[in-house]
């Protein structure tokens, strides 16, 4: 569990360091609907896909890292979700699993999966993933992510 949170903080530390003035910009590659950002020596990379509103504001995201043989998939979901109700992940109409929340920050709540081969394999073979969450006022939200380019994204993260 320590490794999950270490990677979680590496992800956010890496993202914020990219934004710091005077720092070199990350190397960015696009694999269809996924973006991979790496530091300048390509030793630390993060892949993500973000669902945005019509005005461009982020609603939800999936971040993926691969560090020291661990592939971590992180769902970032809006605040005000019912944390007692796990999210449900469906890939191409096939129920994969339900997952409880791990933590929340000031901007989002997170479900973190470490080396979840069933989830990763289903993403590699699928076309779309739908994450269903429930708000605190019991409204259901279906958030659909494209899986186009996911396998190439994972291959990049794993150095293949």
Region spans (language model):
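Sec-dependent N-terminal signal peptides
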Residues: 4-13
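A generic "folded-domain core" signal
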Residues: 19-160
